[in-house]
Amino acid sequence: MTGFGARLAAAKAQRGPLCVGIDPHPELLRAWDLPTTADGLAAFCDICVEAFAGFAVVKPQVAFFEAYGAAGFAVLERTIAALRSAGVLVLADAKRGDIGTTMAAYAAAWAGDSPLAADAVTASPYLGFGSLRPLLEAAAAHDRGVFVLAATSNPEGATVQRAAFDGRTVAQLVVDQAAVVNRSTNPAGPGYVGVVVGATVLQPPDLSALGGPVLVPGLGVQGGRPEALAGLGGAEPGQLLPAVAREVLRAGPDVAELRGAADRMLDAVAYLDV
């Protein structure tokens, strides 16, 4: 078995350093002349799978699938399976976080043998980084990755993430604890525990010792500029995984237009893996 960090590095080397989001917001479905139903959701995802099958990582935003109940989860399962069949690494943007047996249940769903389990999942550390242990253990056992929220782009996040404890910001504590896991499980790197740092964060945490990947959402519509990402938080070359969704998705529903928009963003961030 090959660890997630190595699989991600290989995918980026072969397909480029970009994560493309599937965010089936109702407004986008309407813009694509699709009904805001589970059938419309399925059609939206089918188009996205065809357009993004050649990229390294695709990130479905789980909340937009949950909104359709069981039918939405069924679409998500099929979408994950189709992307993985095309050789794409799938990052489920679920932002799960809890404690004890509940966290263990989330771990089984998103990092175990469940049909929902993707190659990686996002997680929230608000209940304490240690509460993520069941998820981290399940991910390690199944060669999956975990991206833990550290410093997000939304302005509300700063009140918590930049609060200080023991001389470090909360965001830095999250990064440092992720680094401990990576050093203990794969000291030679790359590790399987990454963090999320928004592209528009003005004071990012120090990422130089993380030893794992950094998901950087917020390019394009949200204000993040590809040319401004180099050296984010002291990250090493190849460590960053920029993510884009709406900037690309608004080019749909034509598959070629979607692929072209994603290719242009990939060209803009390709320098990060040089």
From Swiss-Prot:
Pfam families: OMPdecase (PF00215). Its EC number is 4.1.1.23. It comes from the Bacteria. Disulfide bonds: none annotated. The keyword Cytoplasm does not apply. The keyword Lipid biosynthesis does not apply. This is Orotidine 5'-phosphate decarboxylase. It comes from Mycobacterium avium (strain 104).
